[in-house]
Structures are given as C-alpha cells and as structure tokens.
Amino acid sequence: MVWQRQHVLGLADFTPEEYQMVLQTSASFQEVLTRRLPKVPTLQGKVVVTLFFEPSTRTRSSFELAAKRLSADVLNFSPGTSSLSKGETLLDTARTFLAMGSDLLIVRHAQAGVPQQLAAEIDRRGSPVGVLNAGDGLHEHPTQGLLDLFTLCSHLDPRRPRLELLQGIKIAIVGDILHSRVARSDIYALVAAGAEVHLAGPPTLLPKDFAHFVPGHTLPVHWQLEPALEGARFVITLRLQQERMGEFLLPSLQEYHHFFGLTRQRLRLCHPDVKLLHPGPVNRGVELSSEVMEDPGLNLIEQQVTHGVAVRMALLYLMGGGRIPA
C-alpha cells in the first residue's frame, strides 16, 4: 500500500484505508519505541520544520521526538524571535523554509485555516513538501484524533489495532466541545470506526447542532452527564479552554465539576471496564477528580502520550514517502 495524501490537514475526508494505514504503521513504530535503541534511519536526510505560532509544549515535543526517532533533521521555528516580529508575513516565512530545502512543515496556529493556506501555496508552486496540521484554531487537531483512535484500538487488541474493533462501542466525549478542535477530530475518527459516539456538556459549551456535525450521522447530545456515561466503554474528557471562552459561559469551575466532573462514583454508570482519555493538560478537580487521575488502571492518559510519538512517527514516515507492507 502507498500513502497518497501530500498534506494532512484534518480527518473530515480521511478514508477507512487511510485510518488503517496509520494504525498499522503506528503499531510498527510503537514496537520500535520499546527497543534499546528506539531509532530508525527512515527519514535520514529529510528536513522537518515545526512552525508553531501558538504556545505548545506537549505537542511540539512529541513531534520533535517523533522526527528525531526517524533520524530527520528538525528545525524549530519560534515566532517571538523571528522575522515575523519585524513585519514578515506568515507565507513569506514559509517560503523561506521551502527555499532552505524543507521536506515537511508541521504547523500549529490559533487561527483556523492557516495550514490550509500554506498547503495551497505549496500546491500552487508545484512543490512536493507536505503540511501536517498540529492544531488550527477551532478547526481540527488531526494527530490527536489519530492518537486517540490508536490508543482505543490498541487497548482492545495490542497486537493488531484496527478500525473495526470500535464498531458499536459506546464512547462518550465530555466537556468543552464548542472550543475543542480535539473533539472535532475525535468525532470524525470515531464515527468512521463505527463507534456509538455520545456528546455531553453544558448547553453553553455544547450547541445542539453538534448532533449533525458529521454529515449523514446524528450524534446524541446530552446536557446532563449521566445519560452519556451509562454503559460507556470509553470516556474522552476535554480540557476547559478558558483562554478561548468569553464571559458567562460557565458560572464557575466548581460548578462545572459538580455537574460534569468525572469521579469514581459517576464512573459506576459506565461499563465495568471503562477507561478514560484526556488530551491534556488536565485541570485536576475540574474535568477529573484527583482520585481518578491517579488511578492507572482507570485512565489511559500516559498511553496517549506514548502513542502520540508513535502515531506522529507514522504520519511523518508516510508523508515522507514510506511504504507499509500490503
């Protein structure tokens, strides 16, 4: 099988075959990461540039480590110390890196659509350079959606994670869905896998029209937590993004936790083997109680971090021209 997609800008148009290629390749790199020397020369000589116009430690570090594990040369762009502060446009900055011989651009921006703009400019120039969206505004965060998918499938079958494992499985996504690009990518991936996706959150953070977020599908929307949790096999809880919120969307963090915080008592409504995911960073005592957060038998948060490196290795490898066995 050969990867055909030059840019990964979102999951809205991902095919089942593409999801499966990412899962299969991620599983291979997850094995690489367990070796004494967790490094392979597959992208040796390639130049990967991280263009992060929005603060990030976890995602940027994960991408940088993934690229280095593939033996790529990594350039980290910092807008505060760049020519952008002197008036250079974003496109001019990107053109500079293209002229330097970059092979892959990893882009994170607070404004939705910026990675698409860069990809359009690259396509206009006929360049083979790929753009990988590391999160853009309220649009999408495709690598988080893919690593969450890989984490879920790997939990159900560590040796052969695959899309169909989630068919008919109830998964609740809880929290600030309105401001979450992670939620949007997760929804696309989980619906593609055939999961039964339920959305839960306060009315101010979960508009009713999210029920029709994926064309051709109707997602249950709950403004109370309990119906979403009943029988759920997995629960993905989201960070309250206070930096993106206007005033008056929430009375207080304490009230949010009272109605939507995940506690051990509330989780008794779920499947007996329920597992929790969270994209991080976690607001302890808000989205999750400290008791739940500290229980490694209950949450898959550390696995998400580990799997994030493997999934990003897989995407960089595939976009860099790598193949997987048929």
Curated annotation (Swiss-Prot):
L-aspartate binds at residues 86, 181, 239. One of its GO terms (cellular component) is cytosol. It is an enzyme of class 2 (transferase). Its EC number is 2.1.3.2. Keywords: Pyrimidine biosynthesis, Transferase. The keyword Transferase applies. Carbamoyl phosphate binds at residues 58-59, 108, 141, 144, 280-281. Pathway: Pyrimidine metabolism; UMP biosynthesis via de novo pathway; (S)-dihydroorotate from bicarbonate: step 2/3. It catalyses: carbamoyl phosphate + L-aspartate = N-carbamoyl-L-aspartate + phosphate + H(+). The keyword Transferase applies. One of its GO terms (molecular function) is aspartate carbamoyltransferase activity. InterPro entries: Asp/Orn_carbamoyltranf_P-bd, Asp/Orn_carbamoylTrfase, Asp/Orn_carbamoylTrfase_sf, Asp_carbamoyltransf, Asp_carbamoyltransf_Asp/Orn-bd. One of its GO terms (biological process) is 'de novo' pyrimidine nucleobase biosynthetic process. Pfam families: OTCace, OTCace_N. It comes from the Bacteria. PANTHER family: ASPARTATE CARBAMOYLTRANSFERASE, ORNITHINE CARBAMOYLTRANSFERASE, MITOCHONDRIAL. Heterododecamer (2C3:3R2) of six catalytic PyrB chains organized as two trimers (C3), and six regulatory PyrI chains organized as three dimers (R2). NCBIfam families: asp_carb_tr, PRK00856.1. Belongs to the aspartate/ornithine carbamoyltransferase superfamily. ATCase family. Catalyzes the condensation of carbamoyl phosphate and aspartate to form carbamoyl aspartate and inorganic phosphate, the committed step in the de novo pyrimidine nucleotide biosynthesis pathway. This is Aspartate carbamoyltransferase catalytic subunit. It comes from Synechococcus sp. (strain JA-3-3Ab) (Cyanobacteria bacterium Yellowstone A-Prime). The lineage of its organism: Bacteria, Bacillati, Cyanobacteriota, Cyanophyceae, Synechococcales. The gene is pyrB.
